[in-house]
Amino acid sequence: MAALEAYMTPEALPGTESGRIGKLLGLKAKSPLDDIGLADHIARGLAVSAAETLSLALGRAAVVGPLIPEATLRRAKKGRKALSREMSERLYEVSRVVDAVSRLYHGDEAAISRFLNRPHKLLAGRTPMEMAQSNSAGAEAVINMLRRAESSFAV
C-alpha cells in the first residue's frame, strides 16, 4: 500500500478526483488529467500497467482474480494489448473507492486496509472492498457511506 502514502500530504496530490485516480492507476498524461481525459483512457482500455500499479497499492490478491482474471491479464500483457473496457471500468470503480478512503484516512495504510476489508452493517455485512469489486453500484454505495462519514454522520 506504499502508493497510498501520498495521501498523508494532500497538497502533494493532484487537486481533482480524476487526477488522483489517474495517479492510482499510473496513467501518464501530458497535461493534468481531467474527467474527459480519464473517461477517454477508460473507453480506450487501460494498459496492463494500470492493474499492476493498483496492485502495488492494494496487493495483487485484491486486483488479480476479483477484478481481472489472471489469464486475461496474462493474455493482454503477452499480446501488448489494452484491457477491455469492462476490465478498465472495474479498475476505475475500485480506484474511486480507494481514493475516497485514502483521503478520509489521510493515507493511514492500516486504517485504510481495516476499513476496506472489514464487514460493515451499512453494507449488509459485506466488506467495502467486496462492494467496490462487485459493480459500479457497489462502489457508489461505499462512496456514499464515506460521504456520510465526511459529513459527520455516524457510519
Annotate each language-model stretch with its function:
Residues 1-155:
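Non-transmembrane "mature" sequence context
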